[in-house]
Amino acid sequence: MMKLIQNIDVYAPQHLGKKDVLIINDKIVKIKDAGSICADGFLSEAEMINGEGLLLTPGFIDCHVHVLGGGGEGGFANRTPEATMEGLTKFGVTTVVGCLGTDGIGRDMCALVAKTKGLNEQGMSAYCYTGSYQIPVHTLTDSIVKDIMMIQEIIGTGEIAISDHRSSQPTFEEFARVVADTRLGGVLSGKAGIVNVHLGDSPRCLDLIERVVDETEIPASQILPTHINRNEMLFGKSIEYALKGGAVDFTGNEDIDYWETICDEVRVCNGIKRMLDAGVNPDRMTISSDGQGSLPMYSSDGEFLGMGVGQSSCLLKEVKECVFKTEIHLEIAISTITSNPADILRLKGKGKVEEGYDADLCILDQELQLVEVIAKGNTVYTK
């Protein structure tokens, strides 16, 4: 199986200019200046893709998705549906990291690992965290270390909740032990050993995370706090944390105006711009969707309007806002959903348009609308 993409403007995510890109099976095998790879000889059998006027980026990585479905906090009727490969790839997502949230009982680690394996077999790339909001962590085996070390799909622990009324109200010692065990599992397996941390509305914000970094030998690189744009106070603390080298994850939204005006969230594009202006390393920022999570919707008067469901479609929507609204360079904006999560989570072969990397690619037009999505060398979406 071969594909030859010709004369396409490549953002790898750094801007490479117009290139020819050769894909054989599931790998990118050659990237040359436009017009340098000729479709003759054995390449005459390759599928030809005309990239004139189009952009090529890495496939998107959604690093926080409730692939088994989320919700349930308002009762069983509020459980949300599972993610599907088609529902992810049509939005450009070629790699997903699944997690459990508030409900670690009605949904468990056996089901999460099985779902993750299924997505991999269907043709995309999928990983997952062990655990849920709760501490002690509900693992698949008898320990966090063993889960990460022995289960291929498990790359860390999460989403552990802190500063939230739905958390287990862990002590510093309990939280630090989870981070330490997760790091050890990563060290022994060659994985990231990341703890994905859900941040709630409490004014305690990132206190437990900061104490782990300040009072133990564990580096900030072992923790990825998410929902940092939940409110202004939390976001301000997150800037301080990121300036110390910590990675931070913005939660994207499909209805961006609603969450900014009604719920007082920090708009993702504005938040990224503020972090860049403050001097935060752009490599330390990611955007995820909280996909399939339940989203209660209220009017400006506080009237309940209904329950929405998080969608991975918000990733590209937020990138467009960064580029067209706050004039952030595309290289920086697109890295938040490609190379940054790949590097932070140590996802080998992911997140870059580079020779030897996996053929996970998105083709977009000049308005950043998806035209085609390629996962593991196969076309999984066309406009």
Question: Which positions does each model-derived feature cover?
Answer:
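Active-site gating loops and adjacent loop-to-helix segments of metal-dependent hydrolytic enzymes
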Residues: 71, 75-78, 82-98, 147-168, ...
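Metal-associated gating/positioning segment near the N- to mid-region
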Residues: 43-46, 51-114
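Divalent metal-dependent hydrolysis catalytic cores, especially in the metallo-beta-lactamase
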Residues: 83-136, 151-165, 187-202, 221-226
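Active-site core of metal-dependent hydrolases
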Residues: 181-296, 304-305
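His/Asp/Glu-enriched, well-ordered alpha-helical/loop segment
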Residues: 277-357, 361-364
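Divalent metal-coordination and catalytic microenvironments
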Residues: 8, 21, 26, 53, ...
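Histidine-rich, glycine-flanked metal-binding segment
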Residues: 2, 10-57
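C-terminal cap of metal-dependent C-N hydrolases
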Residues: 8-10, 28, 353-383
